[in-house]
Amino acid sequence: MEMNMFILPDFLQIQIESFRRFLHNCIFEELSKFPIIYDSNQGIEFKLIPEKYLLTEPLFTEREAVYKFTTYSSDLYVPIQLTLTKEKKSRIQTVCLGSLPLMTPQGTFVINGVSWTIVNQILRNPGIYYVLNRNGMYTATILCLDVDKRLRLEIDKKGRLSVRINNRHKIPLVFLLIALGLDINDIPDWLQSRTKKLEDLLSGLKNEGERTLELIALYKQLPGPKKVKPKANPLIISEQIQQWCAQVYKLGTSGRLNLNRRLNLNFSKSNDSLLPQDLIAAAELLVKMSLLHPGPKGGKDSSDDIDHLKNKHVISVAEMLRKQLSLCLIDLQIQVRRAIRRGISSKRILSPRSMMISRPLTQMFNQFFGSHELIQFLDQTNPLAEMAHKRKLSLLGPGGLTRRTASFRTRDIHPSHYGRICTIETSEGMNAGVIPSLSICARVDSEGVIENPLHKIGGNIKEQYTVYVRAGRDERLKIGTNNCLAIGQKGQERSTSTQYQQEFVSMSWDQINLRSILPIQYFAIGASLIPFLEHNDATRTLMGSSMQRQAVPLVKPEKSIVGTGIEAHISLDSGTVLISLKDGKIKYVDGKQIVLVDKDNVQQKFNLITYERSNNGTCIHQRPTVKIGFSVRKGQLLADGSATVGGELALGKNVLVAYMPWEGYNFEDAVLISDRLVNEDIYTSIHIQRYEISVQENIEGFDIITREIPHVDKYLLRHLDYRGIIKIGAWVEPGDVLVGKLAPLEAPHLLRSPEGKLLQAIFGVQAITTRESCLKLPAGGTGRVIDVRWIEQQGPSGVSSLHVYILQKRKIQVGDKVAGRHGNKGVVSRILPREDMPYMQDGTPIDMVLSPLGVPSRMNVGQLFECLLGLAGSYLNNHYRIMPFDERFEREASRKLVFSELYKARKFTGYPWLFEPNSPGKSSLFDGRTGEIFEQSITVGKAYMMKLIHMVDEKIHARSSGPYALVTQQPLRGRSNKGGQRVGEMEVWAFEGFGAAYMLQEILTIKSDHVKGRSQVRGAIVAKESIPKPIDPPDCFRLLIRELRCLGIEIKHTIISEKNFFLDQKPI
């Protein structure tokens, strides 16, 4: 594809275009494949009319589906023709096959009120691949459309050929060819000579009885359920083997083209099954490769690079949904055949609608969205996290790799990834390298091939245009990487870095065919947001891109002074901002809607999203940016999102930072901050928590929602209305009742007996038939109630639920995690009064003190360029959008730009300390406590720092008493289990070093797993007595003894002397 001008593609194109292709093409193609079902005995014919299928409009919008906890879907209607051939009657009815989940304009699926996304999968193309194994021998692997089905041709050291089915069963290749129906005389002589014990095999095959047994043995080795008789005809068995191979070993169009190209064959695209001629040609090439390149060091040029992107394709949303639709239609065939048999036996009049007992489409897609491992809970921490999640790729999943089997070679960067898959952004840990991201300019075509845009270089301007190039087609082209100048400083033409044949070489500019369009086109959107990216280590850049996705939207967002220029494009494609769809004038604006009137006096209303909870508990909110009477053009910004300012992405704040030590409070990446960040809500964020309680019917009766809750303090019920539900707008604290609920309880047996009823009548005792099961606010949930929703579940269960939404404003505090865009992260260690913070020469106090030791060892110098340029921009009131790799224009371009802007700020403000020639970028600071000047000059600047979602409110935890493990009788661990902190080996050493013997004894025994000791200590504390010493061993010692007994080792003790020795001898 050629284009004269290049613009950044829609970042959601990989999701939306794929789903559009599914709606417009895949549904019709799958419905067209549905066979005509014909019952010859009764003369009934059943067929679909795919040309007239319909998709209804959804009952709810995507926002209503989220609010009502339902699925955003559309019903699929297909006309069905039922013909009675004997009676010559035909009837056509439009039948609903079920509900099809729809994709929202933001590229997500709303299932039961929750946003989900489908991660695109990378799989190897079907075809044949020759690989050199560890023994120095070539193998040929034939992959089919179903990746689990494969054939492997092997050749041993003696040159004998065999085939291995699904990596398990190994048989001679000649025998498989004969079983597939090939005559012995049609097998080439060279292949017969490379078969082990060929004469015995041929003699056995000539004998009909032995041939039948051999075929049966082969047929049983094939995967899948099979039934065969011992005395079956060998021709029938051979036909069954051929049918099995035709069904299982489907190559598809791409697989057939791959085989034709690699083996020099000429079969039609429609012939997509594996043929005996394919196996013969594959074996012939395998023999030639083994003869030409023998030994473990030979043949690397002839083998296929299985990690090259030309041998892989992307399984997108369309292919996954298409597979589910095909499975649904298979179930429909079975259902129709059963309905025909059932209708014939019961002598009922059949109709298309009566034959559709269930909706197979709904069941199949519910199962798919509920269990598939590539359907993931959408990360909605901020717009960047949402966008990056939709552009992820996965090598895992059905037919793919696993975390444990993925090799280092598979995880590593391949030369074909450049410009297509980001070389930096990937998951950390076990998923490193197997969960990459799509590059910022790359796109996926309808065949699942990743394409990279390049600019063609010609003699004149008309011959220069942009083309999208597939992987593999660019290997013979010379591609300039666009990261350095073609002309040196002295005017001579110099060589430039060029990508050629999977290598980076230096060439002169006149030899280059294509060049890259943008310096950042090799990276994903997260890494592309990092300014001065080229000055950072790749590991820190990876951390910076991942931590940007963890930044929480702030109450007062602020766009960065220093950026890269794609912030507006990300916020626009994420759908968080509101854009005008036509020219017009603003007639009305408030916090919930905007009314626009166009030139034809037609009103258009835009409903704003207000305080909506995301999947991660952050706040989704839109703020109007226009006023009444404003004239707007089509495409102009009407409202900002929760993490955008002026249509640009704004994840953090520009704060004044200093790189210096301060009394050890910024040791090991700790961060010292000013109380100004707390008092002025600089880093205050809004979080919305959802608490729910179910209301259902059980054996004893219905649950009751009421305000009259016995034995509960009335103060805790103060915010409930007359129904027993919390009032909207109430300020609630931990322990408050949100929903008053009484669950039915079966009366005790004694009270239901005649004696019990007599006692109730005499003494007036009422039987307790309910128990309190209220929804109470847990610890750390203080906030304001903003919404209460009653959700009624459809279906036979009849379980309804109440959802209470509580909004919290969280200020930054000690223990919260903050980070920059360059992988510089830290935890707030102390909040100082602003008068105690170091201050600049103009009296401005520092907002944040960072450790200077975090820069040289991490090699992320980009943060220094950013903070110095930000300081100059704050005084000049400028914002900078700098594309990375600016050294392609001039040597030391970044340093020169920063110093020149600092010099401009010095001249503009008259502050000479902003740029001192002896120590550029540094200035003297004063100690806020003493007023004395620090001895050394200190780097000071405006850095863009973000507050991450790892907040101390959700992590801090303490345990007084709690649950214990059943086997070891030791306390559980984790905040969710109300667990304790483990005292490990090194902690025991610390206690021993301080001589805390009694504390150590308590921790290891009565506070841990000494069951009797726990109860004795509790009784002693209640009785105010001294804590007794434990006599019995703890349960961990008993567990050790039992485990040793399982190994056949018995532990006993022997009393050496009984003098003054008392021992209670009990079995352990």
UniProtKB/Swiss-Prot annotation:
Its EC number is 2.7.7.6. InterPro entries: DNA-dir_RNA_pol_bsu_ext_1_sf (IPR042107), DNA-dir_RNA_pol_su2 (IPR015712), DNA-dir_RNAP_su2_dom (IPR007120), DNA-dir_RNAP_su2_hyb_sf (IPR037033), RNA_pol_bsu_bac (IPR010243), RNA_pol_bsu_CS (IPR007121), RNA_pol_bsu_protrusion (IPR007644), RNA_pol_Rpb2_2 (IPR007642). It comes from the Eukaryota. It holds the Pfam family RNA_pol_Rpb2_6. HAMAP family: RNApol_bact_RpoB. In plastids the minimal PEP RNA polymerase catalytic core is composed of four subunits: alpha, beta, beta', and beta''. When a (nuclear-encoded) sigma factor is associated with the core the holoenzyme is formed, which can initiate transcription. This is DNA-directed RNA polymerase subunit beta.
